[in-house]
Amino acid sequence: MKRTFQPKKRHRARVHGFRARMSTSNGRKVLARRRQKGRKALSA
């Protein structure tokens, strides 16, 4: 059986990356929450 997670750097960045988060208002809210929480890494 094939595993479901087949990692690709480009897809990860495009879907979950910083610029993807910044491109929508809700994504900016995500980053704000993670900054407030004190996350070391804000996005993928």
Curated annotation (Swiss-Prot):
InterPro entries: Ribosomal_bL34, Ribosomal_bL34_CS. Disulfide bonds: none annotated. Residues 30-44 have a biased composition (Basic residues). Gene3D superfamilies: 1.10.287.3980. One of its GO terms (molecular function) is structural constituent of ribosome. GO terms for biological process: translation. It holds the Pfam family Ribosomal_L34. Residues 21-44 are annotated as: Disordered. Keywords: Ribonucleoprotein, Ribosomal protein. GO terms for cellular component: ribonucleoprotein complex; ribosome. HAMAP family: Ribosomal_bL34. Belongs to the bacterial ribosomal protein bL34 family. This is Large ribosomal subunit protein bL34. It comes from Limosilactobacillus fermentum (strain NBRC 3956 / LMG 18251) (Lactobacillus fermentum). The gene is rpmH.
